[in-house]
Every structure is written in C-alpha cells, then in structure tokens.
C-alpha cells in the first residue's frame, strides 16, 4: 500500500525538505528512497533560480546570439525543469532528476557561468612558423601512405554535424582559456592556432571533468534551443562521451582523463590555451595511419591532411632541430608478427634500454600476461594512448588498438611498422624519456618512399560493453 507518511513517524526536517521539493507529501516509499538525498534536495530547493536564469541568458547572448529564442522562453524552460519533480512519481526518474539538477546547482556557475565575466588578458605566445617550406615534404610522405583501396559500396560511419557546432566552438575557445588546467585541445583546431590556414570542424578536447562539463553544456543548449539533448557513452572508446541533438546530430565530444594523466601529457601554451604538443600529435597521426579507415580518409581528401602534416613537420623542425635529409638509420624498427597469437615483436635495442617490445593486439591477453608476470609498474595513459605500458626484464609490453597492415603474407607493412614505432615513442614522451634521435630517424624513414600495396590487415580488438546514455527529456541515465 502506498500510504502517506505520518508526520510523527519521520524526522520533521527531512520530511519537510522532501515535501517542499516534490510539492506534495511524499509517499512512504518516496520518503524512504529519497531521505538519503535530503542534503542534495535542500541545495536544489534553496538554489537561486533567478541568478541561474541570468547566467544562461548571458551565455546565450555571448555564444548563441544567432539562435532565435526569447528571454522569457529560456526562463520558462529553466523553471519548468526545476519543477519537473512535482509531476514525477517514478522513483528512478526522480533519482535522475535529482542527480542532474544537483550537477547544475553545484557546478554550472564555476564551469560555464564564469565564461560570462570579463576574461583575463590573452598572453600572445605565437611563433611564426614557415609551414610552406614543409608542404612538399608532407605531400611526398602522405602520397606514399595513400594506398587504401576504397570500396564504394562500403557505408562509412561518419556522424552528421549539428548546426550548433559553430556556437559551441565559440564557447569552447573561451572555455579552454578559463579552464586550461583541466581542459586541453588537440587535433585540427589546435593546429589552427599555429597555422591559421588549417580548416577545422569541432574542437577536440581532453579534460578531467568531462561528464560534469557535458551535462552542464547539454542543459545550456536545451534551455536555449528547447531541443532534447542526449549524452552518449561509447564502450569501445575509453572514457568518451558525446553530445547529440534529438536528430542524432553530433555537437561535441570529449575524452575524460585523470589529473595525473593530464599532468604528463606534453603540451604547449598558445594564447592562454594549452594544446597537446604537436610532436606528440604527429606521432599519434603516424600511429593512426595504420588504421585502415584512416587511410581511406586520406585517399578522399589528401590536401586536408597535407596542411596538418606540414604544420606538424615544421613545428618539429623548428622545435627539435630535425634535419630532413633521409638519414633513417634503423627506422622503422624490425617488426615480426605472430598472427595466430596476435602479437607483434618490435626490436628496440638500437634505440632504447629495453631490448624488444611485445605489442599485443588483444587487450585482455595483455592484462592476463601482466598478471602472470606479477609486475606492478605498468603505466596506463587512458585514452591518450589507448594502452597500458609495462617494462619488465628489459622487455616492454603494450597494447595496440589499431589494425596491423601487411604488405605480404606474414610481413608487417612499413606504414604499420612506423605506427608501432610511434606508439613506443608516445610512451617515451609521456615518461620524459629519450626520443629525439628516434623521432628524427622515424620521420626521415618516411621520405622518398614508394607506395606499397596492402596485402591484408589484422582486425581490431573487439571491445565488449554496452552503450550508455543520459536522456534529459526522458529522465534516464544508463551507464
């Protein structure tokens, strides 16, 4: 039986808090389920909605001025959401509403509200790079990698982009400046800060509070546009979340990383924004080119990639004094693949203190073998490398999440060999190890190469798990 609680049965303060929040006397079940949420509920109840409405209006004026929404519509949407619980009787939905309202109440002002106040002066920190001098070299390197054969019948899984991306980009530029200790960017926008001729779409970010930020941003978009906004979590991408609108159009995504990972990511400071060091990004690009769909992207628009490649090459030339004279020494390092066990052995003794690297193509197998080694010194850099690294008895153990290209039966393609070398160099950069000679040889090994056809490729590791999502309109959280 769903009876109302007796006023003398429950502590008056807790009951009053819940009753005020729900706008009704709670049932016995509601009281017992919600009483542990009394502190959060009280914060929501006393929250100054007028100040919050003012902040959202200011965010709208600054970043979404072209969206046709009136101030009264914004206020009505906000007040409607903060009273939604009064018309909700499902306990699960009430918990979702409380959780999401709590995020807004406790974090919105510091995360997005702060963007409406006067910003600190921008510290101009740009260096003039001669990117043009690297364009021909970049084109030559990419041309030798342009070996994918496009299957025209294959449907590519690229996302549709929301018209709000330009508004969110404008907000993100300011967000990156205000929150540069917890949020950094990489990808085309970060290279645009070095070379204004770079074209970019959405802004790629790594941050330490991704979930909270995306919830706050989703609500800001909802209150301004009135659209239902959904946050999705993809199981095969570590700590990744994306905001989409009700038509499944992509607005922004983010990878979450720990603060200790953020601290070791190599980065540079440009106009009050931290970007991932372009050297690191160049290595990651070389690594990702072993992924067959990335090579297909290259074949579709080589000039887009050429501008990015030339920018990164000029950065490493200027920063590290790399000389592009074709001196490759022992690069790429020798790679032997065991296709049955899905392990690639890379000979590293010419460059590093560990004599070889065992690269596992199945993450669960690596985890099991690390346990058998009884070693506790592994490094997990989360989505920054998508891999754990361990050095034990002069052998590096690591996981590689991409496909391995073969140029012949049992022979690792040089594109993948360089990708594996780059993967090892990412570890060296993250741990402040030596990498510059190896980097120089790796880049020089990409010069004056002929195209080598792809014979076949290994499949990527299959990641288990289910998709998670937060549906604001339907009050559902599934993670």
Curated annotation (Swiss-Prot):
The active site is at residues 202, 204. The keyword Transcription applies. It catalyses: RNA(n) + ATP = RNA(n)-3'-adenine ribonucleotide + diphosphate. Disulfide bonds: none annotated. Induction: Expressed in the early phase of the viral replicative cycle. Keywords: ATP-binding, Calcium, Early protein, Metal-binding, mRNA processing, Nucleotide-binding, Transcription, Transferase. Ca(2+) 1 binds at residues 202, 204. One of its GO terms (molecular function) is metal ion binding. Ca(2+) 2 binds at residues 202, 204, 253. It comes from the Viruses. The keyword Calcium applies. Polymerase that creates the 3'-poly(A) tail of mRNA's. Belongs to the poxviridae poly(A) polymerase catalytic subunit family. This is Poly(A) polymerase catalytic subunit. The gene is OPG063.
């Amino acid at each position: 039986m769903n009876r109302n609680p007796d006023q003398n049965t429950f502590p008056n303060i807790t009951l009053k808090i819940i009753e005020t929040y729900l706008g009704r006397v709670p049932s016995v079940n509601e009281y017992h389920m919600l009483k542990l949420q009394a502190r959060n509920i009280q914060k929501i109840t006393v929250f100054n909605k007028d100040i919050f409405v003012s902040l959202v209006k200011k965010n709208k004026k600054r970043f979404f001025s072209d969206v046709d929404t009136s101030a009264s519509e914004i206020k009505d949407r906000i007040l409607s959401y903060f009273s939604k619980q009064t018309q909700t009787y499902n306990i699960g939905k009430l918990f979702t509403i409380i959780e999401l309202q709590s995020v807004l109440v406790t974090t919105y002002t510091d995360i997005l509200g702060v963007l409406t106040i006067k910003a600190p002066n921008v510290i101009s920190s740009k260096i003039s790079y001669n990117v043009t001098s690297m364009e021909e070299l970049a084109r030559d390197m990419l041309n030798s990698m342009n070996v994918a054969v496009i299957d025209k019948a294959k449907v590519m899984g690229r996302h549709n982009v929301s018209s709000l991306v330009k508004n969110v980009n404008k907000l993100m530029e300011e967000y990156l400046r205000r929150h540069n200790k917890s949020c950094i960017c990489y990808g085309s926008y970060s290279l645009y800060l070095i070379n204004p001729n770079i074209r970019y779409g959405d802004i790629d970010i790594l941050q330490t509070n991704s979930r909270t930020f995306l919830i706050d941003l989703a609500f800001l978009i909802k209150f301004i546009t009135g659209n239902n906004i959904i946050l999705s979590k993809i199981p095969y991408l570590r700590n990744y979340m994306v905001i989409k609108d009700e038509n499944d159009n992509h607005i922004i995504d983010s990878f979450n990383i720990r603060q200790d990972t953020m601290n070791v990511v190599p980065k540079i400071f440009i106009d009050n924004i931290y970007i991932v060091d372009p050297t690191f990004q160049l290595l990651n690009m070389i690594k990702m080119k072993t992924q067959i769909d990335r090579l297909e992207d290259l074949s579709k628009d080589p000039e887009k990639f050429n501008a990015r490649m030339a920018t990164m090459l000029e950065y490493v030339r200027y920063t590290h004094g790399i000389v592009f004279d074709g001196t490759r020494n022992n690069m790429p390092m020798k790679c032997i693949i065991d296709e049955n066990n899905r392990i690639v052995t890379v000979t590293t003794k010419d460059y590093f203190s560990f004599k070889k690297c065992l690269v596992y193509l199945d993450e669960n197998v690596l985890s099991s073998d690390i346990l058998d080694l009884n070693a506790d010194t592994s490094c997990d850099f989360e989505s920054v490398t998508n891999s754990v690294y361990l050095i034990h008895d002069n052998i590096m153990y690591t996981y590689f999440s991409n496909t391995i290209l073969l140029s012949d039966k049992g022979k690792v393609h040089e594109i993948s060999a360089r990708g594996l070398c780059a993967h090892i160099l990412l570890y060296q950069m993250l741990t402040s190890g030596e990498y510059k000679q190896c980097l120089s040889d790796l880049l020089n090994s990409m010069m004056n190469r002929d195209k080598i056809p792809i014979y076949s490729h290994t499949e990527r590791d299959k990641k288990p798990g289910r998709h998670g999502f937060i549906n604001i309109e339907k009050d559902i959280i599934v993670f």
